[in-house]
Regions:
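An acidic- and aromatic-residue-enriched active-site/binding cleft used to recognize and process polar
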Residues: 25, 38, 43-44, 79-82
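Substrate-binding cleft/loops of secretory-pathway carbohydrate-active enzymes
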Residues: 32-34, 40-41, 86-93
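A conserved amphipathic helix/loop scaffold
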Residues: 2, 47-166
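Generic, well-ordered alpha-helical scaffold segments in large soluble proteins
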Residues: 12-16, 42, 63, 67-70
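Short, well-ordered secondary-structure micro-motifs within conserved domains or adaptor modules
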Residues: 33-49, 53
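Aromatic-Pro/Gly-enriched surface loop or interdomain linker
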Residues: 1-38
Length: 166
């Protein structure tokens, strides 16, 4: 299971006093988001875990942007909302404040950041898997864990809501 982030998320959630629903992109388009406080998208690009080509649907992306802006929390794990063919690799990059450089961009530098204290967010001794080629999209995300200039855990305010990347 080391390759499948969503399995670890499911295991963690199963021990918490929270209600969990699995929703589809069709559910999002049908307006179901108002029932939820948090949406999690986890997995590798192109996989059913992450959503693959479903992220090409502008209606899905627009509805999620609006929902977060109005107070929701979007948690993206590994390569959330990743799909080729758009100005950002992660369709939810404006919400997350993080994107991935797949080599398609000519980068003239990255936003500089300082790693902020994550006390109370990460349990003692816990780590976040290191990811390569990640960068901040606007320099406003709070970086709570990083390695070699790559943000690994961030929180980014988006309207009344936020995006969390790990």
């Amino acid at each position: 299971t080391y390759m499948h982030d969503l399995i670890h998320v499911n295991e963690a959630l199963s021990g918490l006093p929270v209600d969990v629903d699995f929703i589809s992109f069709e559910n999002v388009k049908a307006g179901i988001l108002d029932k939820y406080d948090i949406v999690i998208n986890a997995g590798r690009a192109g996989s059913a875990w992450s959503g693959g080509d479903a992220w090409k649907d502008e209606d899905v992306v627009t509805r999620l942007y609006r929902w977060v802006y109005e107070g929701g929390a979007f948690i993206g794990i590994d390569q959330p909302s990743a799909v080729e063919g758009f100005d950002s690799y992660y369709r939810m990059a404006p919400v997350l404040g993080v994107d991935e450089d797949t080599g398609a961009k000519v980068c003239h530098g990255k936003w500089q950041f300082k790693v902020e204290d994550s006390k109370g967010i990460l349990p003692e001794g816990a780590t976040v898997p290191e990811k390569e080629n990640r960068f901040l999209t606007d320099g406003k995300a709070k970086v709570l864990a990083a390695h070699d200039g790559n943000p690994d855990l961030t929180i980014h305010e988006f309207g009344k809501g936020c995006g969390v990347y790990m």
